[in-house]
Amino acid sequence: MVSPPGVLSSLLLLAAMAGGSSQQCSEGRTYSDAIISPNPETIRIMRVSQTFSVGDCTAACCDLLTCDLAWWFEGSCYLVKCMRSENCEPRTTGPIRSYLTFVRRPVQRPGQLLDYGDMMLSRGSPSGAWGDSLEDLRKDLPFLGKDGGPEETTEYSDEYKDLERGLLQPSNQQDPRGSAEYPDWSLLPSNEGGFNATATGDNSAASMEKLQDPTPHPLDQEQLQALNESTWSPTPGHSSISSVWPSSASPLPTEEGLEGEETLQLQEQPSNSSGKEVPMPSHNPSPASLESSPATTEKNSNFTVTPRSRKHSTPTFPTSTVLTGLTPPPWPLSPTASRTVKALAVSAGDNLVLTLPDREAELKASVEPAPPADTTYSYEWSLMSHPVDFQGKIKQENKPTLHLSQLSVGLYAFRVAVSSENAFGEGYVNVTVMPAARVNQPPVAVVSPQTQELSVPLTSALIDGSQSTDDTEIVSYHWEEVDGPFLGEEFPADTPILRLSNLVPGNYTFRLTITDSDGATNSTTASLVIRDAVDYPPVANAGPNQTITLPQNTIILNGNQSSDDHQIVLYEWFAGPGGESKEMVMQGAQTPYLHLSELQEGEYTFQLMVTDSSGQQSTALVAVTVQAENNQAPVAVAGPDKELVFPVQSATLDGSRSSDDHGIVCYHWEHIRGPSAVEMENVDKAIATVTGLQVGIYHFRLTVRDQQGLSSTSTLTVAVKKENNSPPRAQAGGRHVLILPNNSITLDGSRSTDDRGIVSYLWIRDGQSPAAGDVIGGSDHRAALQLTNLVEGVYTFHLLVTDSQGASDSDAATVEVLPDPKKDGLVELILQVGVEQLTEQQKETLVRQLAVLLNVLDSDVKVLKIQAHTDVSTVIVFYVQSGSPFKVLRAAAVARNLHKRLSKEKEAFLLFKVLRVDTAGCLLKCSGHGHCDPITKRCICSQLWMENLIQRYMWDGESNCEWSVFYVAALALTLTLLTGAVSWLCICCCRRRKRTKIRKKTKYTILDSMDEQERMELRPKYGIKHRSTEHNSSLMVSESEFESDQDTLFSRERMERGVLKGSLNGCARNGVSFGYYSKDR
């Protein structure tokens, strides 16, 4: 949270003017390896960031008028304000980097500035710290105990000397802890004292009442002189302020100070921080900072100060309040030319507090002393802070009186600057606009129902009071029993709904009292009547009177309509008066149903007596009338007259609509009149056929007879005419487009026309159309053809219409069935449950479980079809959509994800056991070298192609046809040859190694001299040169223990040698030396 901008501007001005008075501040006693007892009730501590040395910390304490002690602890700077001298007594501690430096100030401080600065910085947390709570201090100062004092420390002895100057040398190291844990020492004070309260939200009124921004007193001559020594240096695009800050008593220049002006960076205080922020001093200002031109100074809503280090970013002000830049004095300031300015006591009046709907205010500035006769004061009003939504009007900004209108809720800070040629003064005032006060409306208690009547065994009831209303909030409900039987101590009294149980008969009255958040109450009552159980006698009902006609002599009387408030335990049927002597058979006389048979003509009366569980009885009578058999003559109906057009092959005579009360047993057709004789078939049946009709009028008579011999006749006229007939015109309906999964359609041929009417329709499927698809209810012989279960493809149906004269016409209708656009996203889930056992509620539960597994919404899982897979399994076809607009996810990815999630979950995660999860259609591309089997969902590869076994069994497991049989065979042959070659090479190497082993020394003897051409050289088997000398003989024999020929090798030397090599005994003229030559290998 951030303080109001008005307080920020006042604090900036205070810091600028404090620079003049702090020039007399000097460094006092210093202590090393020492701490103080930071009791929050006696001292106040503020942590300062962006300090690089003990000297910086001491200078910061000098710059703050309320600071008494600069504490440098472990690379961090803390400013301490001591209420009393004994509160800041140094104490010794262990070998840690802790230095205490007391500052010396003049006895006479500027009273106005001191009071104002103390008040500005003392409005902190109740703990007494300027910005750091006790918990935050414990993070920085680990030696603090729970009471806030040091642990195991002793008082500092007088033998401690002043701190060496080397400790005051600047350090370029920055506090490694940063601003994440500690609030930075910046220009913005905390909100806990009321400086950061905003005028928005529900709590604005409470926060505004705490905020009282005082107006500073008139400046004395010394303070104005210090103000004249300050400089105003504009920054491009912003209004910035640079002040000459005094250093400590013995300032040590830092590297940053030598390079240029050191200024402070404005940093925004985090909202959860309770610390205040104080401006960081700048030392050794450069001459450039002392130059300013008022002509280049402009107003801006943002205050920017050059950062001390480029490593820190420049934060921004909060958006809840808008700051207006400070306006520099109207006269030019120069560090080399000082002038005397008279201080004016300017008052902008008391702080104003307005409450909506009051949106106007008037601010008036008063100045002391009054202007001389020849001089007038210039007034300049500036709005330093206002709410973000401020759109009001400000009038007469350059006059003593400022008119404000159309103010919105929030805090406004105004500054008025009064100046003349040699005088200057300024004042501040706050205007707070509070929201309109709310008028509380009392709550309205509502109970439902207000009246209830129950009868035993119902002994429980509910009374709902949750429908009660209030303009804010109902905080409590209280039920109490006003009248009725006592309910005991377990009576639920503080719930919106009153639940009652185990009630006894009686009249109850309950009162509900509700209370809202403002303490207003309202009550209402509800009544409840519990009645005792009443046992009413049963009501017997034997049913209505019955009448039957012989030969029917059986009937069933039904008494199950009898009723009782509890239960009927006994049914009894009796023959009524006048029926005891008649013969009949009664069955089920003690059941609700009485079966009567062998009844005779006459009237019967039967009595039903019912008995309930308490023994109460009731009776009812029913009459059964048996009438004598009454035969009526049949009625012959030959049908309507017919008019036929010649030529006609045959005509149908229909007498099936003839009727009789007992049934017709005989039909007879006869030709009674006509132009020529005709041939008739089935003349003794209800429907007869006539052929051989010629042009003329024919009369046929139908005679029917019943079982009693009664008969009846009817005549039919058939007129055969010769006239022209126009053929019908068939219209099948044209072309239709159907998109799966919608696989049903109706083709309408009723628009076919004929001059005398169409008598028959016939739909014929074209031979090139798909065979799949069913005709519903024989509609292929009707005007409208109904089709279902169509598959992807183009269907052609021919409509053949025929009129009464046999003329016909045909037309074709085309149905193009397009594939389902969601086909690639359909997933097939087979569950171990019969399709007849799967209910709608279980289906919705399955959808929710699938949505949880797939991490989607329930509405994203769409079930298209549920059908039987086997007698004990059901297949569910669904797809999953996501995104906006909706996009159907790929079935392969959904099936793979669902299979993976099911393998990780418990076995009983779904309602039923999952038998298989796969795509509904076969979507495999098979690498373009095969096709996908729709049953097994596996690729069937073409000839000379096979499956990539590595991808199938080691990677994603998707069936494919990526490998060529030739390539695989060539690779296998290559690997086989390579394996054989490597094996052969290894065997050869092993044998060679075995042959090179040194054998036992072999002895040789010289053979007899032989012909020079048969000279041979005897050599060891493995080429090892013998140590024996050369001999002249050409042949040598071994005398070793092994006489085998396998131990010696003979090689024939070439007859001629260029140069004979010498041996130990010299050269032999007729022989060569015995040795090893690599070429003999």
From Swiss-Prot:
The keyword Amino-acid biosynthesis does not apply. N-glycosylated. Keywords: Cell membrane, Developmental protein, Endosome, Glycoprotein, Membrane, Neurogenesis, Phosphoprotein, Repeat, Signal, Transmembrane, Transmembrane helix. InterPro entries: Ig-like_fold, KIAA0319-like, KIAA0319-like_C, MANSC_dom, MANSC_N, PKD/Chitinase_dom, PKD_dom, PKD_dom_sf. Residues 1-22 form the signal peptide. Residues 168-331 are annotated as: Disordered. It is a single-pass type I membrane protein. It comes from the Eukaryota. Residues 23-99 form the MANSC domain. It is found in: Cell membrane; Early endosome membrane. Residues 197-206, 222-234, 283-307, 314-324 have a biased composition (Polar residues). Residues 23-964 are extracellular. Residues 986-1081 are cytoplasmic. Involved in neuronal migration during development of the cerebral neocortex. May function in a cell autonomous and a non-cell autonomous manner and play a role in appropriate adhesion between migrating neurons and radial glial fibers. May also regulate growth and differentiation of dendrites. This is Dyslexia-associated protein KIAA0319 homolog.
